[in-house]
Amino acid sequence: MNINATILGQAIAFVLFVWFCMKYVWPPMMAAIEKRQKEIADGLASAERAKKDLNLAQANATDQLKKAKADAQVIIEQANKRRAQILDEAKAEAEAERNKIVAQAQAEIEAERKRAREELRKQVAVLAIAGAEKIIERSVDEAANSDIVDKLVAEL
Protein backbone atom coordinates (compact mmCIF):
# COMPACT_ATOMS: atom_id res chain seq x y z
CA MET A 1 0.00 0.00 0.00
CA ASN A 2 1.47 3.20 -1.12
CA ILE A 3 0.80 6.45 0.58
CA ASN A 4 0.64 8.88 -2.18
CA ALA A 5 -0.56 12.40 -2.57
CA THR A 6 -4.12 11.36 -3.39
CA ILE A 7 -4.61 9.60 -0.11
CA LEU A 8 -2.92 12.40 1.71
CA GLY A 9 -5.18 14.92 -0.09
CA GLN A 10 -8.24 12.83 0.70
CA ALA A 11 -7.20 12.59 4.35
CA ILE A 12 -6.71 16.37 4.55
CA ALA A 13 -10.07 16.90 2.81
CA PHE A 14 -11.72 14.45 5.20
CA VAL A 15 -10.18 16.19 8.24
CA LEU A 16 -11.31 19.57 6.89
CA PHE A 17 -14.79 18.12 6.25
CA VAL A 18 -14.96 16.71 9.80
CA TRP A 19 -13.70 20.00 11.24
CA PHE A 20 -16.26 21.96 9.15
CA CYS A 21 -19.06 19.61 10.25
CA MET A 22 -17.98 19.80 13.89
CA LYS A 23 -17.73 23.59 13.72
CA TYR A 24 -20.82 24.52 11.68
CA VAL A 25 -23.12 21.52 11.16
CA TRP A 26 -22.88 19.56 14.41
CA PRO A 27 -23.80 22.37 16.94
CA PRO A 28 -27.08 23.33 15.19
CA MET A 29 -28.00 19.66 14.84
CA MET A 30 -27.27 19.00 18.51
CA ALA A 31 -29.15 22.18 19.48
CA ALA A 32 -32.15 21.03 17.42
CA ILE A 33 -32.01 17.56 18.97
CA GLU A 34 -31.68 18.99 22.50
CA LYS A 35 -34.49 21.45 21.80
CA ARG A 36 -36.69 18.62 20.56
CA GLN A 37 -35.80 16.49 23.62
CA LYS A 38 -36.64 19.43 25.89
CA GLU A 39 -39.97 20.00 24.08
CA ILE A 40 -40.85 16.32 24.41
CA ALA A 41 -39.92 16.31 28.12
CA ASP A 42 -41.92 19.52 28.67
CA GLY A 43 -44.87 18.00 26.80
CA LEU A 44 -44.75 14.87 28.93
CA ALA A 45 -44.48 16.94 32.12
CA SER A 46 -47.34 19.15 30.95
CA ALA A 47 -49.45 16.08 30.20
CA GLU A 48 -48.68 14.72 33.67
CA ARG A 49 -49.61 18.06 35.27
CA ALA A 50 -52.81 18.18 33.21
CA LYS A 51 -53.68 14.66 34.33
CA LYS A 52 -53.14 15.64 37.98
CA ASP A 53 -55.16 18.83 37.48
CA LEU A 54 -57.95 16.82 35.86
CA ASN A 55 -58.02 14.40 38.78
CA LEU A 56 -58.07 17.34 41.21
CA ALA A 57 -60.84 19.06 39.24
CA GLN A 58 -62.88 15.84 39.19
CA ALA A 59 -62.43 15.48 42.94
CA ASN A 60 -63.48 19.12 43.47
CA ALA A 61 -66.47 18.67 41.18
CA THR A 62 -67.51 15.56 43.09
CA ASP A 63 -67.15 17.39 46.41
CA GLN A 64 -69.13 20.37 45.12
CA LEU A 65 -71.83 18.07 43.78
CA LYS A 66 -72.11 16.32 47.14
CA LYS A 67 -72.25 19.70 48.91
CA ALA A 68 -74.89 20.95 46.46
CA LYS A 69 -76.97 17.81 47.02
CA ALA A 70 -76.69 18.23 50.79
CA ASP A 71 -77.64 21.91 50.52
CA ALA A 72 -80.57 21.03 48.28
CA GLN A 73 -81.73 18.42 50.78
CA VAL A 74 -81.53 20.97 53.60
CA ILE A 75 -83.49 23.49 51.52
CA ILE A 76 -86.12 20.85 50.69
CA GLU A 77 -86.46 19.92 54.36
CA GLN A 78 -86.80 23.59 55.32
CA ALA A 79 -89.42 24.07 52.61
CA ASN A 80 -91.35 21.04 53.84
CA LYS A 81 -91.23 22.34 57.42
CA ARG A 82 -92.37 25.78 56.25
CA ARG A 83 -95.17 24.20 54.20
CA ALA A 84 -96.33 22.22 57.23
CA GLN A 85 -96.16 25.35 59.38
CA ILE A 86 -98.16 27.35 56.83
CA LEU A 87 -100.76 24.57 56.61
CA ASP A 88 -101.05 24.43 60.40
CA GLU A 89 -101.42 28.20 60.58
CA ALA A 90 -104.04 28.16 57.83
CA LYS A 91 -105.94 25.37 59.58
CA ALA A 92 -105.83 27.27 62.87
CA GLU A 93 -107.02 30.46 61.15
CA ALA A 94 -109.81 28.58 59.39
CA GLU A 95 -110.85 26.93 62.66
CA ALA A 96 -110.87 30.29 64.45
CA GLU A 97 -112.86 31.87 61.63
CA ARG A 98 -115.32 28.97 61.67
CA ASN A 99 -115.75 29.28 65.43
CA LYS A 100 -116.25 33.04 65.08
CA ILE A 101 -118.86 32.58 62.35
CA VAL A 102 -120.64 29.86 64.34
CA ALA A 103 -120.65 32.07 67.45
CA GLN A 104 -122.02 35.02 65.46
CA ALA A 105 -124.68 32.82 63.90
CA GLN A 106 -125.68 31.42 67.28
CA ALA A 107 -125.85 34.93 68.72
CA GLU A 108 -127.99 36.07 65.79
CA ILE A 109 -130.23 33.01 66.17
CA GLU A 110 -130.61 33.65 69.89
CA ALA A 111 -131.38 37.34 69.30
CA GLU A 112 -133.90 36.43 66.61
CA ARG A 113 -135.44 33.83 68.93
CA LYS A 114 -135.79 36.41 71.74
CA ARG A 115 -137.25 38.95 69.35
CA ALA A 116 -139.71 36.36 67.98
CA ARG A 117 -140.72 35.32 71.51
CA GLU A 118 -141.26 38.93 72.50
CA GLU A 119 -143.29 39.56 69.36
CA LEU A 120 -145.28 36.39 70.01
CA ARG A 121 -145.94 37.44 73.60
CA LYS A 122 -147.23 40.79 72.44
CA GLN A 123 -149.49 39.17 69.87
CA VAL A 124 -150.76 36.60 72.38
CA ALA A 125 -151.48 39.38 74.86
CA VAL A 126 -153.42 41.30 72.22
CA LEU A 127 -155.29 38.15 71.22
CA ALA A 128 -156.02 37.28 74.84
CA ILE A 129 -157.42 40.73 75.49
CA ALA A 130 -159.48 40.58 72.30
CA GLY A 131 -160.74 37.13 73.24
CA ALA A 132 -161.57 38.25 76.75
CA GLU A 133 -163.43 41.29 75.41
CA LYS A 134 -165.49 39.12 73.14
CA ILE A 135 -166.25 36.69 75.92
CA ILE A 136 -167.26 39.33 78.36
CA GLU A 137 -168.82 41.41 75.61
CA ARG A 138 -167.77 44.52 77.18
CA SER A 139 -164.60 46.48 77.06
CA VAL A 140 -162.03 45.55 79.59
CA ASP A 141 -160.54 48.49 81.42
CA GLU A 142 -156.86 48.27 80.56
CA ALA A 143 -155.74 50.25 83.60
CA ALA A 144 -157.65 48.02 86.00
CA ASN A 145 -156.68 44.78 84.39
CA SER A 146 -153.07 45.59 83.51
CA ASP A 147 -151.91 43.29 86.31
CA ILE A 148 -153.79 40.39 84.75
CA VAL A 149 -152.30 41.14 81.32
CA ASP A 150 -148.77 41.46 82.78
CA LYS A 151 -149.15 38.11 84.54
CA LEU A 152 -150.39 36.54 81.32
CA VAL A 153 -147.44 37.96 79.37
CA ALA A 154 -145.00 36.76 82.04
CA GLU A 155 -146.45 33.25 81.90
CA LEU A 156 -146.05 33.11 78.14
UniProtKB/Swiss-Prot annotation:
Gene source species: Pectobacterium atrosepticum (strain SCRI 1043 / ATCC BAA-672) (Erwinia carotovora subsp. atroseptica)
Entries under HAMAP family matching the protein: ATP_synth_b_bprime
Cell location: Cell inner membrane
Gene3D superfamilies in the cross-refs: 6.10.250.1580
Protein name: ATP synthase subunit b
Summary of subunit composition and partner proteins: F-type ATPases have 2 components, F(1) - the catalytic core - and F(0) - the membrane proton channel. F(1) has five subunits: alpha(3), beta(3), gamma(1), delta(1), epsilon(1). F(0) has three main subunits: a(1), b(2) and c(10-14). The alpha and beta chains form an alternating ring which encloses part of the gamma chain. F(1) is attached to F(0) by a central stalk formed by the gamma and epsilon chains, while a peripheral stalk is formed by the delta and b chains.
Record's keyword annotation contains Cell membrane: yes
Alphabetized InterPro entries for the sequence: ATP_synth_B-like_membr_sf, ATP_synth_b/b'su_bac/chlpt, ATP_synth_F0_bsu_bac, ATP_synthase_B_chain
Any one GO CC term of the record: plasma membrane
